[in-house]
Swiss-Prot record:
It is found in: Cytoplasm. It holds the Pfam family Adenylsucc_synt. The keyword ATP-binding does not apply. Keywords: Cytoplasm, GTP-binding, Ligase, Magnesium, Metal-binding, Nucleotide-binding, Purine biosynthesis. The active site is at residues 13, 41. Binds 1 Mg(2+) ion per subunit. One of its GO terms (biological process) is IMP metabolic process. The gene is purA. It catalyses: IMP + L-aspartate + GTP = N(6)-(1,2-dicarboxyethyl)-AMP + GDP + phosphate + 2 H(+). This is Adenylosuccinate synthetase. GO terms for cellular component: cytoplasm. SUPFAM superfamilies: P-loop containing nucleoside triphosphate hydrolases. Homodimer. GTP binds at residues 12-18, 40-42, 304, 330-332, 412-414.
Length: 427
């Protein structure tokens, strides 16, 4: 039995999809365990580029299972659009499995997300407005509708009517706006559920069977540790737990099944949306990173905020997710910069701190303490080992590893699969 969890160590968009796809070649099952279609990842497969939001990266390997676990919130209509788009491009989706215990995103969740952001005004969280947060709220309130409920017409009808009554009063009282009606939702979403029924099963049993058969299971994380609702920059976080430990809850497997945790990061830092970002850049170096790195959100298209690498963040992520190995992406983006910087600690009210503050006010007063290293101008996109990298680029990666106390097992020097380099076997 062997399993690997891939998690983002920053604020998402670290390149987890690419690393998952890379590791998926040797896996038997690839499973998602948290988030929803707010997560976007770009995959290059067979010379083509695909942008996925809900579908696991393993979908491209027809002999492997691609699992959407119970911890994922599923918009049935959005998922069908994604599946149809893949089918139109000749990709079979017969290997998809969807948990019957996953929560369903409905139109009132999306509207609630939109209205909540409007209500917050300048204090908005910066959500993708996909209904993720409200769906998780309903789950916690025990009024959520699960995939198993969606497939049963009588159950779905009753639960939906009850929720529409409740949401109608809530929308009117909180926003002064109407809730989507039963008639606008029922037939469309029931039909969507029927189309998805062929994929629905008890995915926890699927994963357990894989472990019993000594198969290799790859868990695909969404977002990043710094967006975790418990361990991230609260309240500027997602509504779920992207940390590796959530595999046990969102995947439905025991903690003893996890063998390794791969922490994925960029050679710099990026963030979409609002919230603290101590190493954020607003100068020419920031412009260089954004444009060369094509830093625009897969889901939203919004320009990402960019900054220098923050080892305080990565050390926090290492502890929160039990990271055993590091994958550093987008090293090529820094090529051409005269100097590169790594944040080693923060200064808070005249004192040096090396731990990430929980208090938002403290965090806003933190000033990054940088270590400056010489940059490089040599082309790194063809490098296949650490030894082939320019001396300054190699020293930069080694310094990150030293500061974060995690060994580098993968490094990437470009967007293509053959630009991802494995330094040791992870399976």
């Amino acid at each position: 039995m062997s399993s690997i969890v891939v998690v983002g160590t920053q604020w998402g968009d670290e390149g987890k999809g690419k690393i998952t796809d890379f590791l998926a070649e040797q896996a038997d099952v690839i499973a998602r365990f948290s988030g929803g279609n707010n997560a976007g990842h770009t995959i290059k497969f067979g010379g083509e580029t695909y942008k996925l939001h809900l579908v696991p990266s393993g979908i491209f390997y027809k002999e492997k299972l691609a699992v959407i676990g119970n911890g994922v919130v599923v918009d049935p209509v959005a998922l069908l659009k994604e599946l149809d788009a893949l089918n139109e491009r000749g990709i079979s989706t017969d290997n998809l499995r969807i948990s019957n215990r996953a929560q369903v995103i409905l139109p009132y969740h999306i509207k609630q997300d939109e209205y909540e952001e409007e209500r917050r005004g300048d204090n908005k969280i910066g959500t993708t407005k996909k209904g993720i947060g409200p769906a998780y709220v309903d789950k916690a309130q025990r009024i959520g509708i699960r995939v198993a409920d969606l497939l049963d017409k009588e159950t779905f009808e009753k639960l939906l009517k009850d929720n529409i009554e409740y949401k109608g009063a809530y929308f009117e009282g909180m926003f002064g706006k109407a809730c989507p009606t039963f008639e606008e939702i029922f037939e469309t979403y029931y039909a969507a559920g029927q189309r998805l029924a062929q994929f629905v099963t008890d995915t926890a049993k699927v994963l357990d069977d894989a472990f019993v058969a000594d198969e290799k299971v790859l868990f695909e994380g969404a977002q990043g540790v710094m967006l975790d609702i418990d361990h991230g920059t609260y309240p500027f976080v997602t509504s779920s737990n992207p940390v590796a430990g959530n595999v046990t809850v969102g995947g439905g497997v025991g903690p003893t099944f996890v063998s390794k945790v791969i922490g994925v990061c960029k050679a710099y830092t990026s963030r979409v949306g609002d919230g603290p970002f101590p190493t954020e850049l607003f100068d020419e170096d920031g412009h260089h990173i954004r444009e060369v790195g094509r830093e625009y959100g897969t889901t939203t298209g919004r320009p990402r905020r960019v900054g220098w690498f923050d080892s305080v963040v990565l050390r926090h992520s290492r502890r929160a997710s039990g990271i055993t190995d590091l994958s550093i992406n987008s090293i090529d983006v820094l090529t051409g910069l005269k100097e590169v910087k790594i944040c080693t600690a923060y200064e808070l009210d005249g004192k040096e701190i090396t731990e990430y503050p929980a208090n938002l006010k403290d965090l806003q007063r933190c000033k990054p303490i940088f270590e400056t290293l010489p940059g490089w101008t040599e082309d790194v996109t063809g490098c296949r080992s650490l030894e082939e990298l320019p001396n300054n680029a190699r020293r930069y990666l080694e310094r990150i590893s030293e500061l974060c106390d995690v060994k580098i097992s993968i490094f990437s020097v470009g967007p293509d699969r053959n630009q991802t380099n494995l330094l040791k076997s992870l399976w």
